[in-house]
């Protein structure tokens, strides 16, 4: 520890076991808080930009279409197979698991193709352990559509170990609607606090 060294800091310990280190590092004067293993919990650079490397955050997308979605008025899980990023490794399979209780910003963007106007409704939603959020469309257009986008964001209250996943539900019409991957079907989220 010290105040004038290039790498100056404070070590917090309990009975001679290092628990946390608060340190100013290098000529850039970046400020770090690290755990005993050296993992950075918080970084503040000289421009006052704060980063939290392990902050729960993710974005996933589809690498291929999910074709001919069922039209039987039951929810079906939208599958995701490509992680763009997963800041704390909390996304597995097709769902995000909250590592801690808090408010989470969750967003879904879907690109639907071959929309059937005979469907009574189409909805895309985010289901969490506490509740469901969704956007509903009653496709009363003059003819079938080549494509249609459904997207929304929500701030969800989640407890530790709660899960969130995306679902699709269609009532009536033909099972002809495809969830296209190439034009931006993705699911993302991050911990607000």
Describe the residue ranges of each PLM region:
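Extracellular jelly-roll beta-sandwich "head" domains, especially the C-terminal globular C1q domain
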Residues: 42-193
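Self-maturation zones of extracellular/virion spikes and adhesins
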Residues: 1-40, 56, 62, 66-67, ...
């Amino acid at each position: 520890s010290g105040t004038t060294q290039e790498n100056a800091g404070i070590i917090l310990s309990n009975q001679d076991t290092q628990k946390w280190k608060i340190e100013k590092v290098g000529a850039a004067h970046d400020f770090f808080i690290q755990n005993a293993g050296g993992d950075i919990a918080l970084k503040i650079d000289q421009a006052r930009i704060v980063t939290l490397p392990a902050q729960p955050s993710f974005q996933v997308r589809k690498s291929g279409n999910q074709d001919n979605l069922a039209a039987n008025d039951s929810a079906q899980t939208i599958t995701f197979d490509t992680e763009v990023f997963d800041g704390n490794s909390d996304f597995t399979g097709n769902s995000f698991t909250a590592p801690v209780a808090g408010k989470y910003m969750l967003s879904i963007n879907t690109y639907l193709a071959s929309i059937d106007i005979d469907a009574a409704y189409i909805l895309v939603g985010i289901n969490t352990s506490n509740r469901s959020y969704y956007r509903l469309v009653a496709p009363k257009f003059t003819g079938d559509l080549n494509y249609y986008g459904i997207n929304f964001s929500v701030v969800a209250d989640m407890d530790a170990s709660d899960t969130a996943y995306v679902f699709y539900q269609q009532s009536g019409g033909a099972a002809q609607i495809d969830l296209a991957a190439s034009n931006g079907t993705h699911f993302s989220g991050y911990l607000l606090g």
